[in-house]
């Protein structure tokens, strides 16, 4: 099902949670609403669900104005971060709940529950209670319950936020496979850039109630339209506006940002480079993170493979030279403000 958010705004008292957002979601897409706490992503999800009503603008579902429709009329499945399963009901009864409310024939309910238990890889668990399941299993039951009524849209509000890191990583790979099987238009809220990059077809980056950028994971990561987007999606370094490195920047009105993996090191001078000193080396499995200090005292982070670090024989206090690849250039005043927002 297609979704059109047409200039929607929502205020809570004096606080503007969503500010004049226009967003179009294609049928069958898996979309991540990504941003920091308080950016409006969960409010936008609740507006789509019908749990909140907009102060202005319209919400269109499959070409029909659904702005004032109730949740029950929109045929939307909603999964919360904390599962919200009925503790006194078995797994099968939890999944069947929505179908029973709709007075679906018992034979159909039984067949649908068995089908969904297979789909979410919980066949044989129908007779268990939520307390007998792990967190990851409970979240899969919640997803099965949402899918039971064959919703036109599936909405997930930070569905893996309450789980530990390993389970979260396993479940998001499973969610991607599940989506590829059922092809339901799905929107999920997350503050985790890695989760958004790994799972989604489209990422919507939000900040202060507004949409900063919409695009595929590759587009968002490789071609950020603002310093906020670039810094929220991973570590960045702010580089000095050096005429030797960036001769095209004639005025000191630009901010030059670069990711740690787009910097390379050498122990000998040669070509355009920044002189620096190794302050600390952090060994992170196959990767080494080198914390440097430039001549002007500015910190810099460089990510290297173990092989590269071993070949350079890096050590603390060693002088090195930093070459820059793929820098991104933004207006300085806006970039300073956005970097502070992304770090907040």
From Swiss-Prot:
It holds the Pfam family TOBE_2. GO terms for biological process: sulfate transmembrane transport. One of its GO terms (cellular component) is ATP-binding cassette (ABC) transporter complex. It comes from the Bacteria. Gene3D superfamilies: 2.40.50.100, P-loop containing nucleotide triphosphate hydrolases (3.40.50.300). The keyword ATP-binding applies. Residues 3-233 form the ABC transporter domain. It is a peripheral membrane protein. It is found in: Cell inner membrane. Keywords: ATP-binding, Cell inner membrane, Cell membrane, Membrane, Nucleotide-binding, Sulfate transport, Translocase, Transport. Its EC number is 7.3.2.3. ATP binds at residues 35-42. GO terms for molecular function: ABC-type sulfate transporter activity; ABC-type thiosulfate transporter activity; ATP binding; ATP hydrolysis activity. It catalyses: sulfate(out) + ATP + H2O = sulfate(in) + ADP + phosphate + H(+); thiosulfate(out) + ATP + H2O = thiosulfate(in) + ADP + phosphate + H(+). Part of the ABC transporter complex CysAWTP involved in sulfate/thiosulfate import. Responsible for energy coupling to the transport system. Belongs to the ABC transporter superfamily. Sulfate/tungstate importer (TC 3.A.1.6) family. The complex is composed of two ATP-binding proteins (CysA), two transmembrane proteins (CysT and CysW) and a solute-binding protein (CysP). This is Sulfate/thiosulfate import ATP-binding protein CysA. It comes from Gloeobacter violaceus (strain ATCC 29082 / PCC 7421).
């Amino acid at each position: 099902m297609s979704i059109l958010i047409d200039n929607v705004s929502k205020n809570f008292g004096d606080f503007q949670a969503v500010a004049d957002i226009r967003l179009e979601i294609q049928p069958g897409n898996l979309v991540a609403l990504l941003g920091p706490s308080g950016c409006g992503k969960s409010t936008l999800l609740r507006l789509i669900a019908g749990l909140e009503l907009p102060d202005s603008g319209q919400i269109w579902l499959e070409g029909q104005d659904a702005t004032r429709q109730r949740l029950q009329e929109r045929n939307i499945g909603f999964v919360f971060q904390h599962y919200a399963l009925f503790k006194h009901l078995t797994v099968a009864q939890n999944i069947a709940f929505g179908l029973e409310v709709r007075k679906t024939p018992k034979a159909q309910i039984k067949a649908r529950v068995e089908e969904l238990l297979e789909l979410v890889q919980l066949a044989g668990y129908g007779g268990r209670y939520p307390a007998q399941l792990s967190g990851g299993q409970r979240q899969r039951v919640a997803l099965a319950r949402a899918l039971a009524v064959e919703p036109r849209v599936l909405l997930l509000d930070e569905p893996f936020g309450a789980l530990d890191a390993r389970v979260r990583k396993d479940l998001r790979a499973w969610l991607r496979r599940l989506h590829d099987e059922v092809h339901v238009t799905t929107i999920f809220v997350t503050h985790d850039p890695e989760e958004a990059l790994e799972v989604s077809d489209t990422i919507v980056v939000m900040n202060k109630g507004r949409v900063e950028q919409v695009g595929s994971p590759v587009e968002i990561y490789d071609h950020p339209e603002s310093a906020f987007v670039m810094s929220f999606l991973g570590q960045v370094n702010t580089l000095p506006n050096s005429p030797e490195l960036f001769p095209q920047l004639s005025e000191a009105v630009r901010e030059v940002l670069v990711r740690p993996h787009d910097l390379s090191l050498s122990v000998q001078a040669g070509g355009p480079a920044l002189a620096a000193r190794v302050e600390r080396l952090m060994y992170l499995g196959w990767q080494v993170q080198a914390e440097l200090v430039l001549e002007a005292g500015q910190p810099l982070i460089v990510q290297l493979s173990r092989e590269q670090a071993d070949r350079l024989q890096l050590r603390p206090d060693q002088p090195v030279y930093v070459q820059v690849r793929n820098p991104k250039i933004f207006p300085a005043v806006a970039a300073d403000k956005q970097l502070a927002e992304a770090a907040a």
